[in-house]
Design a protein with these regions (language model features):
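Glycine-rich loop at the start of a catalytic domain that most often binds anionic cofactors/ligands
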Residues: 35-41, 73-76
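Active-site and ligand/interface coordination hotspots across diverse enzymes
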Residues: 1-35
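Active-site histidine-anchored catalytic micro-motif
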Residues: 4-6, 65-127
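Short loop/turn segments at strand-loop or loop-helix junctions that form parts
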Residues: 25-26, 62-64
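Structural motif
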Residues: 19-21, 57-58, 105
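Short catalytic helix/loop segments, enriched in acidic residues and glycine
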Residues: 40-52
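Short glycine-enriched loops at secondary-structure junctions
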Residues: 57, 63-66
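Single conserved hydrophobic/aromatic residue that forms the stacking wall/gate
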Residues: 125-135
Length: 135
């Protein structure tokens, strides 16, 4: 179930029972001369979507804008700073937790996202935003 394809009332009903949500992260960058620019996001979203269908969970909108400065010489690459990515991920994750999702699973498809994701998870574990929920 894609979160963006449901109403807020449907979400409210679904998260009455302890419920998690899965979010895919990837990148928008080159993958060779014939590879798709969205490969990392497409792959992580495909995996996340498969899990959500089997686990009856929501799939959050994917985050495909991530640190990829090393690929900026290739047209079509979109890169944001690690700090911007961390801020975006933290705010999105905090929003989901505040609305009642018990946990957020992150399926990552881009190597440069690993450290920023770890940083955000550490911040959420030590903040009130997590409120005993887990990422």
């Amino acid at each position: 179930m894609r979160l963006e394809q449901t109403s807020w009332m449907e979400v409210r009903e679904k998260i009455k029972d302890p419920q998690g949500i899965i979010m895919a992260t990837g990148s928008t960058e080159q993958h060779g001369p014939i590879g798709l620019i969205g490969t990392d996001t497409i792959c992580s979203e495909t995996i996340a979507s498969g899990v959500t269908s089997k686990a009856n969970m929501y799939l959050a909108p994917s985050i495909g804008f991530t640190p990829a400065e090393f690929n900026m010489k290739f047209p079509g690459t979109i890169s944001i700073s690690a700090q911007t990515f961390k801020s975006l991920l933290r705010e999105v994750t905090s929003s989901l937790l505040k609305h009642g999702f018990k946990y957020v699973l992150i399926v990552n498809g881009h190597g440069a996202n690993i450290d920023p994701i770890k940083d955000v998870i550490c911040l959420l574990y030590t903040s009130d935003a997590a409120d005993e929920k887990r990422c």
